[in-house]
Structure formats: structure tokens, C-alpha cells
């Protein structure tokens, strides 16, 4: 595009922004309508309307896609490692769950600290630290032969690295969009589907032939290439804030933010249960039982169909609002989890996997869109998102080990854990309803 034409286009976009802001995502406060009391005085005068498209915006979205691919995509592949580690290490499923749960916990827990650093203008440093930690974790895991070694490498080191990478995938991408914010975040979060399909397929093909060590190294090479691209290409749009607290406690004075955070705590207690346990369930409970390879196919399907849930949910979230869609989605997830109790044949297992994959993908994608909707101050958006991640981290740390402990206590029967997680979804839905009722439009 010629320079003059590009300038005219930008000018038109800015002139029309105030009119367009009225039709933004329902239930969200338009960025341009924020008063000086709601936006930091240090940066308010420098913030221009989100471009809602363009090269930099979509490049940032692609970077967010790669970040989710190498963080949540790898985490969502843990089901295949859960199965392998249970056999290889001869440990109970609840013990193995701690490896994945610690990784997920740290991915969320460090969010509050990372969010403030991003707001302060240190995006490149945050991305570099995250990349280094993830690569150290994956390559040291490839050399691990003991349970405690995998806890340190795949659990702690990869988890810390993920924590540096997950928050910017949401907070930075969201600043480039207004009307299409939910769609852009949805495209970014679809990276977790890409990663799950890629890493599950790699592990499925390489574990029997190349062995565990080279399987992990091959995954590490893919992560290195894509994460280095992100470190170079991803840029923040907003000027750095010159001041601010590490934790914005004022956020919890907003009832909608507080109720949303509590609700997603209960939802995240339950949402990964299906991702971790559908494979062992298919080998232990249904009749006839599935083979190891067939059970891994369920994981591929579970993650693959998630792309439909993510894209459809975020497309309509821009029309109806993320909270409005999140409420029925979490309620349907509760019904799906309770219905899992009745799954007792391979056909039922495949049907349930497709259905839950779509619903679970929708929840994981609408969640960050919902946070962005509730965050009214652009200068502290990273901190608000990070704090939410930190609270939810404790749910992800304990959810699957609790489920594993219930299964072990019931001599390998799953219905107790399924009922517990279905109930957790119901409680979470109730708090999201409360958040919607208290949301200030």
C-alpha cells in the first residue's frame, strides 16, 4: 500500500473509531470511552485506538498462536505422557498427574509478576526468559529417568517458562483489537490445538521407534524454532507504564472481576480432567477396552475438534459477548462430565470425546476473552490478566491430583471423580452468572 494511502486509511480508522466503539463486543467497556480516572495518566495521552487489523496486529496474533502452541499445546499433550510415565515409572496415575499439574500451576502462577513487567515495557525480556526456561526444561526432561527428575524438568522448569509466555499471548494481542478482540484471541488460543496435534502426533510416532529421549528432543527443536520467531517478531503496542503496583488489589473491588475469577477457579478445577484421563479410562473401563495406540487417538480427536469450539465461540463472542457465551458453555460442560459416567463402549467414548473436545476448547478460548472484557484500564491490562491467572493456578495444581486420588480411593472406578468435577463446573457456572449480573456496561 502506498504511504499516503496507508496514512489516509489510518486516519479514517481513527476518525471512525468512536462510532465503531458503540458496536464493540457486547458487555465490554470500549477502550476509547475510558476516562482519565480509569486510565493511567502516564500513558493515557499516548494511547491511540486499537488498529483492529493490519500487519502488526495480525503478526502479533500469529505470535500469540505460536506461544499457545508451545505452552498449552504441549500441556494438552500430557495425556500421552501420563500414559507413558504410568507404565515406564510404575507409579500411580495420581503421582504422575503432579508432573502435569505443577506445569499448569506455574504456567498460571507467575502471571501476576509477568503481567506487570509487560506493562512496564519489558516484553522482549519476558519472552526471552520464557523461551530459555522452556528449552532447558524440555531438553533436560529428555535425559530424565526418575520421577523427581521429570518433576524438576517438565514440571517446574517448563512450567516457569510457560508462565512467562502465556500472559503476553493474551495481554499483548488484546491491545491491538477492539471490535474483533475475541476473534483475535480465539485465533491465538487455537495454537494450543495446533501444538496438541503436532506434539501428540510426534510422540505417537516417535516413542515406539526413537525412544523417549529423542522424542522430547524433537519436540524441543520445534519449540526452539517457533519461540525464537516470537522473540524477534512480537512487539507491544502500548507505551510502558512508568509506575504501578505489582498486584493491583483494586481489581478485586470490582464484583464482576472477583466473581469471574472465583468462577473460573472452579471451572479450571474440572476442565483438564477429560484431557488427562480419557485415555486411561478407555483402557480400563469401557468394553472392549482400547489398546494403547487407540487410546492416543482419542487424545488427537479431543484436541483436534477443539479448534471448532474455539473459533465458533470467539466468533459469536464478538457479537453476543464472551460472558454471555461462557455461561451456557460451562453448564453444558457440567452435563458432559456427568454423562461421562455412562460411557462404557468404544463408540460412546469416541462420541463423548468429540463433544467434550468442542466444549472444552470453547471454555479455554472464551476464558481469556472474558478477562479482557472485564479489564477496563489498558495500562494495567497485563497485571489484571496475570492476577487472574495466578488465582486459577491453584485450581490447575490440585484438580487432576484430586481426581486421581478419588479414582485410587475407589479402586480404579471413575464415577466419583466424574461427579466431583461435574459439580465443580456447576459451581463455576453460578459464579460466572454472578459476574455477568454485576458487570458494568
UniProtKB/Swiss-Prot annotation:
- Primary localization: membrane
Any Gene Ontology CC annotation: membrane
Q: How does it sit in the membrane?
A: Multi-pass membrane protein
Keyword list (alphabetical) reads: Glycoprotein, Membrane, Transmembrane, Transmembrane helix, Transport
Superkingdom is Eukaryota
**One Pfam family per UniProt:** MFS_1
Region feature Disordered, mapped onto this chain: 1-47
Q: Name one GO molecular function term.
A: transmembrane transporter activity
Presence of the UniProt keyword Transmembrane helix in the record: yes
KW Nucleotide-binding (keyword) present:
no
Q: Where in the cell is it found?
A: Membrane
Q: Which residues cross the membrane?
A: 61-81, 95-115, 125-145, 150-170, 183-203, 212-232, 259-279, 289-309, 323-343, 351-371, 389-409, 415-435
Q: Which residues are glycosylated?
A: 388
What upregulates or represses it? Highly expressed under trichothecene-producing conditions.
Q: What does this protein do?
A: MFS-type transporter; part of the gene cluster that mediates the biosynthesis of butenolide, a mycotoxin that shows antibiotic activity but does not seem to play a major role in the spread of head blight in wheat.
Query: What does the sequence similarity comment in the record state about its family?
Result: Belongs to the major facilitator superfamily. Monocarboxylate porter (TC 2.A.1.13) family.
State what protein this is by name: MFS-type transporter
